[in-house]
Each structure stands twice: as structure tokens, then as C-alpha cells.
């Protein structure tokens, strides 16, 4: 085989090489958030009274719904027995037009009737939930078109990912609930800065295992390392995680606190009027009672080019609502106490309503 030496190589050309195409800029690496070394990995205790004793603040998140209401009654009962009711703060994340009318006022009334002196309302700044869907769509569309151009494809033919929240992309919870509530944690931490140590906040959430397979996997007590830092340690407590629907309603009956009328209309849950995780019955109820909001959602479907819920459009939900209106007439609230009676019986429900009339002047 012929060998080559250095002198056999072709002479170097003096012609300038053709310019190379610029490599696409590498995406900026997201900085990994480090958790402060003082934040514990696991809770020190899972015993309810010990959790309350250890906490500097006991923050109860209230949506105004039945699970929040039952949880509030239980937490207040334990805190009062310990002489620590002054630690309890109730917070409501105001969702604007997305939530049922009067929900914030009901959540505050429930807190006041329980004897809680501090009630806080937080709200995400800027656009509301429905407008955030449109903003998100614009960003997703711009990103998809940019990637298509870089790949030499027609940007007009790109498929834009769904902008609506979903069970796998619950950005609505982080944007309009969890994020704003963390701003309250920051304020509460500042109020106890004189302690000279991380402030201990017990965050109470009314999530129950019976609601879904996903919630069944949640721990009753855990450290919220994402919300904790060197100034505050957040322990998440789900006091009613193992409770059944019947136990929730029995607690409400004993508490004598008013509950939201949407349950008498047949709703299983009280979240957004039109929640992407809601069942068909809850969504149709929402469209019948707040038709102008359902119409706004339907218009947004057209704007973002995707159904409100995978396999179920808001247009179809509105159609089902109209069918029921034609069959039953305009929706009217069934007799007060209907929802409770299904779980605890009419006798206990009548007793609950009579107590409300005597104590709070509410109609029996």
C-alpha cells in the first residue's frame, strides 16, 4: 500500500473558505432551584395536634366548597381546643369571573362564623383565567411557528399545542391559586421575622383521596419544599384526606355553617364554574346557571382552535344545557338542603337548617 508523507499533501489553498451557516443558538439552560439546607425532607410529626402546636401560622385554604368547609371546621375545632385559634388564617384565592358568584363572600362568612379573625383574599395580578388561555395560545403559536421556520417548514401549517389547562397541564392551579397564596406566605413570614429562625407555616388543603386516583396518591402530611426556603418552612397538611363524602356532610351538618347552593343544584364539586376537570353534570350545571360565561368560553375555543376539554367542547356543553332547559324549563335551585339530605338524611338536614335559622337568621 502506498504511503504518504507530509510533502505529498496538497498545498494549502489561499482562498477564503465558504462561510458556514450559523448554528442555532442553544436554548438557555434553566437554572435548577436549590432548596435551602435548613428545609427538612420529611415532617417531624403527622399527629394533628402536634402539627398545630409546632406551627407559627396555620393557613387554611378555602375555596368555599364543601371539602374546604369541613376541613375548616375540623382545624378550628382542634386549634380552639389547644388554645391556638389565633394562629389560624383563612385564605381564599379569588378566581374572578371563573368562579361561582358569591363564593368569596361565602368563604369569608364561613371563616367568621367559625371564629377565625383573619381572612385573606389573594388574586393573581393581570389577566384572568380565560384571558390567560388566549395569552398562552399566542405564546405556543409563536413558538411552534419559530420552530417550523428553523426546520425549513411552512409555519402556516404548524399544529399549536392545546392552550387550555388539563389534568396533565394544570397551569391554572399554579398561576391563579398556588402562586398568589405563596405571596401570603411571604407576608406572614415577614410578620414573624423577629423570631430569628425559619417561620413554620402549616398549610391546610382540603384534598381528599376519594376525589380522584391522583389525589389518592397524595400524602396526608408532607414538606412543601418548593414553597419553603431559608426564611420559611411550609408543611402541607390534608386533614380530610381519608374522609368519605358522608363524613364531610356530617361535619357540615354539625358545624351549622352554610354551604354553597351549587351543591343543591347537583354539583359534585365547587371549583371554577366551568372547570376542565369537572364532570359532565357539573359543566352542564355551570352552563345553565352562567350562560354568558359559557358563551365566552365557546368564543375562546374558536380563538385558540381547540376544544375546552379533550373530547368535549364548550359548544357541546352549551347544547346539552339548552336541551335540559327545553325539557325542564329554566334552571331553578331545588329546595335548600337537597344535597345534604342525600348524604345524612332529611331529619338531620332539617335540624341543621333550624339551627341556622336560630343562630344566624338564615332561612330555614
Where are these regions (language model features)?
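Nucleotide-activated chemistry modules centered on ATP-dependent adenylation/adenylyltransferase
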Residues: 2-364
Amino acid at each position: 500500500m502506498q504511503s504518504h508523507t507530509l510533502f505529498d499533501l496538497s498545498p494549502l489553498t489561499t482562498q477564503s473558505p465558504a462561510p458556514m451557516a450559523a448554528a442555532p443558538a442553544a436554548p438557555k439552560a434553566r437554572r435548577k432551584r436549590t432548596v435551602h439546607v435548613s428545609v427538612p425532607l420529611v415532617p417531624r410529626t403527622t399527629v394533628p395536634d402536634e402539627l398545630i402546636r409546632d406551627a407559627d401560622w396555620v393557613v387554611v385554604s378555602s375555596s368555599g366548597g364543601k371539602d374546604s368547609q369541613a376541613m375548616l371546621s375540623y382545624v378550628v375545632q382542634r386549634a380552639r381546643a389547644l388554645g391556638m385559634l389565633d394562629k389560624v388564617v383563612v385564605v381564599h384565592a379569588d378566581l374572578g369571573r371563573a368562579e361561582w358568584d358569591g363564593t368569596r363572600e361565602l368563604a369569608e362568612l364561613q371563616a367568621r362564623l367559625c371564629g377565625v379573625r383573619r381572612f385573606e383574599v389573594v388574586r393573581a395580578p393581570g389577566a384572568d383565567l380565560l384571558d390567560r388561555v388566549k395569552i398562552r395560545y399566542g405564546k405556543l403559536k409563536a413558538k411552534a411557528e419559530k420552530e417550523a421556520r428553523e426546520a425549513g417548514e411552512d409555519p402556516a401549517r404548524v399544529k399549536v399545542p392545546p392552550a387550555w389547562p388539563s389534568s396533565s397541564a394544570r397551569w391554572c392551579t399554579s398561576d391563579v391559586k398556588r402562586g398568589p397564596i405563596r405571596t401570603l406566605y411571604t407576608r406572614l413570614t415577614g410578620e414573624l421575622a423577629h423570631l430569628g429562625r425559619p417561620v413554620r407555616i402549616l398549610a391546610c388543603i382540603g384534598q381528599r383521596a376519594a376525589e380522584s386516583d391522583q389525589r389518592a396518591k397524595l400524602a396526608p402530611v408532607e414538606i412543601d419544599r418548593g414553597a419553603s426556603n431559608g426564611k420559611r418552612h411550609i408543611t402541607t397538611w390534608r386533614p380530610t384526606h381519608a374522609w368519605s363524602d358522608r363524613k364531610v356532610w356530617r361535619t357540615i351538618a354539625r358545624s351549622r355553617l352554610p354551604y354553597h347552593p351549587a351543591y343543591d343544584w347537583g354539583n359534585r364539586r365547587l371549583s371554577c364554574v366551568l372547570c376542565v376537570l369537572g364532570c359532565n353534570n357539573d359543566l352542564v350545571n355551570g352552563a345553565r346557571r352562567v350562560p354568558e360565561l359559557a358563551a365566552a368560553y365557546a368564543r375562546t375555543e374558536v380563538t385558540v382552535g381547540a376544544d375546552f376539554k379533550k373530547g368535549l367542547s364548550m359548544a357541546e356543553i352549551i347544547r346539552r344545557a339548552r336541551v335540559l332547559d327545553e325539557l325542564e324549563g329554566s334552571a331553578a335551585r331545588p329546595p335548600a338542603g337537597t344535597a345534604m339530605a342525600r348524604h345524612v338524611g332529611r331529619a338531620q338536614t332539617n335540624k341543621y337548617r333550624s339551627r341556622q335559622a336560630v343562630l344566624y337568621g338564615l332561612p330555614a
